[in-house]
Design a protein with these regions (language model features):
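A general alpha-helix detector
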Residues: 2, 48-54, 90, 108
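Basic, short loop/linker segments at the boundary and entry of helix-turn-helix/winged-helix-like folds
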Residues: 7-54, 59
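Long, acidic, intrinsically disordered low-complexity segments
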Residues: 1-9, 417
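Anion-binding and metal-coordination hotspots
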Residues: 60-73, 84-479
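Helical catalytic core of nucleic-acid polymerases
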Residues: 24-28, 34-41, 46, 70-83, ...
Length: 479
């Protein structure tokens, strides 16, 4: 059979193969050279394996076994392999090993995209999406259970080693596979034990009754709430996307269930892996807080986000107060530094609470005895308030960066900039899940989950790049 006739001249698999040939694969060849001379199978060409995975993800294939099967009959895979089979173990190992090589690969592609003016870093979006880990909620155990499992696993390792030293009852390959499986389980249990200890120390200061639990299958996975309202072991994948053509510039799997602390980390990764910081970054309200605003200002990055007040009128209404008795409705005298309640009483300054990130909370309270005899007490006091209760309000003194941020976000120009967020950021998430089927990781562990997400985003970038070269609308071409 003539292999060249398997695919048309303009087939995307040819473009992927041509691109892989332009990349510097030194990192992968160095890894191969490091194990040359050792027993084992001949190593498959990294260019072929890279091309296979990029082509597979572009077609929604994330299983190494399925990709190995496709190499037997799918024309694009057959063309790449030259009608030769590729082991699913080779494919699986290549995907989750050599993170330095994959990072270098991603950086080279970003360099090519930047050289063509497709990535400018003038404006990027940051958004996170929850992707299910390769673990079940039933695998989460406490310290006592993990300790018992770990003890049994270590004993099994000892017995297998003794058996190997004496006389193997099983065939050599089966015996080696059995020992390897037991060692891997022991390693996961040791990681689960470390994670349980870390969580217990981290949370016991806030909750004395907290009982730490970790997965014995993927210890780094945390239970998170997903978009369907359920809770499953997951990773929170943070994606930074350039808004000019919707190309991904950075991706990272994290163990934080919320995005609150992720903006600073994303900026650090951009500077480290891309070599420069974006001029502007756009993120939703989950990222918008004093720490993020301060971090962006310190990095010299213009931040656009949706500020969510931590003290809302609805929270006051839940206490049974009418609108006139909400603290934000109290007039404030900046010169004399006091608030006036609906009864006309002055709430004087009583204390200053120093918060993190330069935030100071000023506390104002009514004089003693005033609230107990006030005719408006029933409208002002929460249900069940004690007789000595006094009304208090707070005033937040924000850092200059936060004040400037809030003023900027009130402008029409800033709102138009922020409106780009959902169109750019959420499309990437949809492509990862719907086109690639990445609703659950195949690999275990945060680092390997990051690598799997990187392969997906690399394939996504190439799909859009090829579409732009053909003059197609990038969004339409990717669907």
């Amino acid at each position: 059979m003539d292999v060249e006739k398997l695919v048309d001249e303009d087939h995307c698999v040819r473009a992927i193969w041509e691109l892989a040939g332009r990349l510097d694969l030194r990192r992968y060849h160095e890894q191969i050279a490091a194990v040359e001379g050792s027993a084992g199978r001949e190593h498959t060409d990294p260019r072929l394996l890279i091309s296979l995975w990029l082509y597979a993800y572009s077609r929604g294939i994330s299983s190494a076994r399925e990709l190995a099967r496709q190499c037997e009959y799918e024309p694009g895979c057959q063309w790449l392999c030259g009608l030769q089979p590729v082991s699913h173990r080779t494919l699986s190992g290549f995907r989750s090993e050599n993170k330095a090589g994959l990072d270098d690969l991603f950086a080279q592609v970003l360099g090519m995209l930047s050289a063509e003016g497709l990535i400018t870093l003038e404006r990027v979006t940051l958004d996170g999406t929850k992707i299910k880990a390769n673990a079940s909620g039933n695998t989460f155990r406490g310290r006592e259970k993990i300790a018992a499992y770990l003890k049994a696993a270590r004993e099994q390792v000892r017995l297998l080693n003794e058996e190997a030293e004496n006389e193997e009852r099983l065939a050599p390959r089966r015996a080696a596979a059995r020992r390897r499986a037991v060692r891997q389980r022991t390693s996961r249990l040791e990681a689960a034990w470390r994670e349980v200890e870390r969580l217990q120390q981290e949370k016991q200061h806030d909750r004395k009754d907290f009982v730490a639990r970790a997965s014995t299958t993927d210890p780094e996975a945390h239970v998170m709430r997903n978009g369907e309202g359920g809770t499953v072991p997951s990773y929170n994948v943070q994606v930074v996307t350039d808004t000019k053509h919707g190309l991904v510039v950075n991706v990272e799997a994290t163990t934080d269930a919320i995005d609150y602390r992720q903006l600073d980390a994303a900026l650090e990764r951009c500077e480290e892996k891309v070599g420069q910081l974006p001029q502007q970054i756009v993120a939703d309200g989950d990222y918008t807080n004093h720490a993020s605003v301060q971090s962006a200002a310190e990095h010299g990055v213009d931040f656009y986000g949706s500020w969510q007040n931590s003290w809302k009128a609805s929270e006051q209404d839940a206490l049974g107060r009418k609108a006139a008795f909400v603290s934000t409705a109290f007039p404030y005298d900046a010169e004399q530094d006091y608030f006036v309640c609906p009864a006309g009483e002055k709430l004087q300054h009583r204390a200053v609470l120093n918060r993190r990130h330069g935030v100071r909370t000023h506390v104002y309270r009514a004089p003693k005895g005033v609230c107990s005899a006030c005719p408006l007490r029933d409208d002002c006091a929460p249900p069940g308030a004690k007789p000595e209760w006094r009304r208090s309000v707070t005033r937040i003194e924000e850092p200059g960066a936060t004040t400037a941020f809030k003023a900027k976000m009130k402008t029409e120009e800033a709102q138009q900039t922020y409106a780009q967020r959902s169109r750019v950021a959420e499309f990437v998430h949809a492509w990862m899940k719907e086109r690639c089927g990445l609703r659950q990781f195949r690999c275990r562990g945060r680092v390997k989950a990051t690598m799997e997400a990187t392969w997906v985003c690399l394939s996504y970038n190439l799909t859009r790049w090829f579409a732009l070269r053909r003059g197609l609308h990038p969004t339409a071409a990717s669907l």
